[in-house]
Amino acid sequence: MHCPFCRHPDSRVVDSRTTDDGTSIRRRRQCPDCSRRFTTVETCSLMVVKRSGVTEPFSRTKVISGVRKACQGRPVTEDALAKLGQRVEEAVRATGSAELTTHDVGLAILGPLQELDLVAYLRFASVYRAFDSLEDFEAAIVELRAQRPSAEDRGSGETLEVPAPAIAAD
């Protein structure tokens, strides 16, 4: 690594630590020529292959931005969005692959988003899964109702009734 001060082509690592979120390594280096110290941060590059075939670096900010649109008007905090972004990044990095498709990233978003807010989940899923009819929405809602734990499973004595949507007959 070149010294940023004197451009000497070598440096010595003085200290090495992982960052708080564990996604990168912070190294303290010292130049053998000018003896000045500097810090570098190393991360594994994670690339996303888009539908068009274009490859771009994974962006947690882009994930949060997309989810924020689905959460618009919902009681979801910025802190919750940041945690979701971190969970998604951890999930995609855990695959061990250096390249992912946008489909893989979308799948990684759906799980944490479903836990965060069901309405936002439906909004995101409608775009991600390309819903093009009311039947697609109804099928997703039926699937969510089937996954929802019953009142006994949650430990309360109450029963939760989720009414089916009323559909007007023409």
From Swiss-Prot:
Pfam families: ATP-cone, Zn_ribbon_NrdR. One of its GO terms (molecular function) is ATP binding. Residues 148-170 are annotated as: Disordered. Binds 1 zinc ion. InterPro entries: ATP-cone_dom, NrdR-like_N, RNR_NrdR-like. Residues 46-136 form the ATP-cone domain. Its cofactor is Zn(2+). A zinc finger (unnamed) spans 3-34. Keywords: ATP-binding, DNA-binding, Metal-binding, Nucleotide-binding, Repressor, Transcription, Transcription regulation, Zinc, Zinc-finger. GO terms for biological process: negative regulation of DNA-templated transcription. Negatively regulates transcription of bacterial ribonucleotide reductase nrd genes and operons by binding to NrdR-boxes. HAMAP family: NrdR (MF_00440). PANTHER family: TRANSCRIPTIONAL REPRESSOR NRDR (PTHR30455:SF2). Belongs to the NrdR family. This is Transcriptional repressor NrdR. The gene is nrdR.
